[in-house]
Amino acid sequence: MKLHELKPTPGSRHERNRVGRGMATGNGKTSGRGHKGQKARSGGGVRPGFEGGQNPLYRRLPKRGFNNPTRKEYAVVSLDTLNRFEAGTEVTPELLIETGVVSSAKDGIKVLANGKLETKLTVKANKFSGAAKEAIEAAGGTVEVI
């Protein structure tokens, strides 16, 4: 078998069906669009969600909630991911981005107590959960809110 001898499996490839190319093709005259009407015209058709004038579903259902314009979204870091750093390291948001722990700092870094911390670290972040703060201090490290 050589590269120039490769062929697709029979039946796996289909030629495009060109419509409006004469009556003998079976797809001439109306080109599969039926007779007249909105859907037969060029650019015809209704927008997605249109229900023929009936009040559409998205308008029948009630509105819920609101979007807080001042919402802060924190990049989350778990304690077990901090184990990759050597003891005595000062863990900063810049270091976390540099090492690929978080892709971006978003509105800040929040440390959560998922997993167990075995190394003594100085952790600088914008927020800490109570349990994370206790776990870092129990491991002999220090917590700094920036």
Curated annotation (Swiss-Prot):
Belongs to the universal ribosomal protein uL15 family. GO terms for molecular function: rRNA binding; structural constituent of ribosome. Residues 1-69 are annotated as: Disordered. This is Large ribosomal subunit protein uL15. HAMAP family: Ribosomal_uL15 (MF_01341). Binds to the 23S rRNA. Keywords: Ribonucleoprotein, Ribosomal protein, RNA-binding, rRNA-binding. InterPro entries: Ribosomal_uL15, Ribosomal_uL15/eL18, Ribosomal_uL15/eL18_sf, Ribosomal_uL15_bac-type, Ribosomal_uL15_CS. Residues 42-52 have a biased composition (Gly residues). GO terms for cellular component: cytosolic large ribosomal subunit. PANTHER family: 50S RIBOSOMAL PROTEIN L15, LARGE RIBOSOMAL SUBUNIT PROTEIN UL15M. Residues 1-18 have a biased composition (Basic and acidic residues). GO terms for biological process: translation. Gene3D superfamilies: 3.100.10.10. Part of the 50S ribosomal subunit.
